[in-house]
Amino acid sequence: MIAELAGVSVTTVSRVLASGADERGRWAGPETVAAILEIAERSGYRRNPHAASLRTSRSDLVGVLVPRLQDFVLATVYEGIDEAATERDVSTFVTNSLDRPELQRARTRSMLDRRVDGMIFGDAHLDDPLLDELAEEGVPFVLVSRRRGDHVAITCDDVAGGRLAAEHLIAQGRTRPAVLSGMAYASTAVDRTRGFLEAYAEAGMPLPPERVIHRGFDAAAGREATEAVLRDGPVPDALFATNDFAAIGGMGALRDAGLSVPDDVALVGYNDTPLAASGSIALTSVRSPVHRMGRLALESLLAIVDGRGAESRLLAPELVARASTGPHPG
């Protein structure tokens, strides 16, 4: 980051970059100012009018960035955000990043150019520095659904959720599971998988790495991941998918392979979307309080904008058992 490379505080960097040429000397010596400007230029920094505008005015506008609003979970998160915003006479607008860092960056800058009071990100990547850069610039923001570093985040306790799925399958006698893990850049995939693996390891049944398959979160990716599991190793007696849609795709792949759910393979999803309960074989799923996450994210952001500050929140998951994890035969 600019402050680290220049050897000064984030506050000094923020003041120098926010000031005009004739005012920068108030905050640092000429050599330090020159170093900050040079590093900022090399890193592609664009001056953000946002932080300065917050000192004098409020737009009562919040920007929201999600991977795909057509995703039921993200749509429900946004519903909670917008509901809480309406109650506080704040407007929101939302845009998709498609989980592409370059698009996330461009659309973030576009929102900031519109002088939003702050931003809510539902598309945080564990390996992308954008959020650290925004924090250095003094931009108020909150993460929702996903976490990154020590930034304020409103999430489900996904490690606990993964454990719930594992404990349920262990109680059903399932000893050879595989995991449809999602993408490694998303904390939801990482944390849910971690909780699941920890619970199985503690039960004396550690999973080999090849039993954890990283693919996307939609049904097509779930089908592809399940086909890889069936092709590359022995048939598992259980599948844990870190997303309901991936689980439903996995169910289709199992059916096409002539395997029965739950007799041959038990199946657990995550988020408990309405689709989980409506299929021909109702899906056991870990319920995540996504609507409440959205409300709390908006409330937390406004607290930060108002100078009151906010802390990260972990909301409790709940396992909803259905037909896809019926009793293990024998």
Residue ranges of predicted features:
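Short, well-structured alpha-helical segments in soluble
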Residues: R105-R115, A220-P234
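Hinge/beta->alpha junction and helix N-cap segments in small-molecule ligand-binding domains
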Residues: P49, V66-T76, V94-L103, D128-P129, ...
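Periplasmic-binding protein-like
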Residues: V116-D123, A178-S181, V212, G233-N243, ...
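Alpha-helical recognition/docking segments in bacterial nutrient-uptake
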Residues: P49, T56-E167, A171
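Short beta-strand segments enriched in small/hydrophobic residues
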Residues: L5, V10-R15, L54-L69, H168, ...
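Flexible loop/turn connectors
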Residues: E227-G330
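N-terminal helix-turn-helix DNA-binding module of bacterial transcription factors
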Residues: M1-S57, P329
